[in-house]
Swiss-Prot record:
UniProt-listed HAMAP family: LpxD (MF_00523)
One Gene Ontology cellular component: membrane
One protein family per Pfam: LpxD
Protein name: UDP-3-O-acylglucosamine N-acyltransferase
GO molecular function: N-acyltransferase activity; structural constituent of carboxysome shell
EC number(s) per entry: 2.3.1.191
Gene name for this UniProt entry: lpxD
Subunit structure: Homotrimer.
Family, per entry: Belongs to the transferase hexapeptide repeat family. LpxD subfamily.
Record-linked InterPro entries: Hexapep (IPR001451), Hexapep_transf_CS (IPR018357), LpxD (IPR007691), Trimer_LpxA-like_sf (IPR011004), UDP_GlcNAc_AcTrfase_non-rep (IPR020573)
Amino acid sequence: MKFSKLASKLGSETITCSLEKINHLDPDIQGVAAIDEAKPGTLSYIEGAKFANYLKTTNASALILPMDETLQKLAGERGIGWLSSKEPRLLFAQAIALFYRPFQPTPEIHATSIVHPTAKVGKNVYLGAHVVVEAGVKIGDNVCIYPNVVIYPNVEIGENTILNANCSIHERSQIGKGCVIHSGAVIGGEGFGFVPTPEGWFKMEQSGKVILEDGVEVGGNTTIDRPAVGETRIGKNTKLDNLVQIGHGCKIGKNCALAAQVGLAGGVKLGDNVILAGQVGVANQAKIGDRAIATAQAGVHNDVAAGEIVSSSPAVPNKIYLKASAIYKRLPEIYQFVKQMKRKL
């Protein structure tokens, strides 16, 4: 594909393109690659000026650049085709989609799969080897279910959803349209509900359900527990990384992103567009407002206001954390100073 044709297929955020100025920079693009691994005939991208050194050495034939005239000039001097955007990473993601097509199996119900007579399976559905579909399950059109998936009774799965191999969807769970569940995930397993008694722990039955709204993606070995009563809900287009634990009764808003090893205790509520970085822990019943961010390994014990950024454990506003970190580095120096002052008293 000519670079000019590729550029025309990318998003509206493209502002400047070398093809408008230097017509001979219209290489053939045969694929995409990381900037440090790119070969002639590939497209790559640079997200910011701090990666300028890669531009000096890359073998890419074309680049997606930020709105930076210095980078544009350097690319032109090296004979590299380029286009600039306010969102270079987004455009590169779009470019990948032009070259990469995920594996799409031919619709069929494998001979070794087991489908209960009361289950309803839509059109153009793929059920791989050893899939188990229990009583009362409803599967929409164009759903793809890979081998060894187990779907418990009365589950509903929306159209165009993908369940990867070896995941489990427990009873009464509702999976929306266009969701992706990766291998090893457990959706709707029992929440951690036990009541202490003098004789030991009394098990509280978990009669609720899990609801994933449309466009939710759940990473490998992530678990989303159902509650004793009511529902655990994951909002539209929210993305969960691998190894995330969502406790019983949590309510997560739309367009949230939770990185690996995040853990939410029971009853946590997240607003829309919340970001939790790796290994963030959120305590029981805590509320986090819209657009809030918790940085890596934050321990959130209290509510977080909308738009706030918190860090550390226990979590504090990020500005306070940064100041405290600067002081922490100077503690040996401060200690020596205090020690000397005490001698003078």
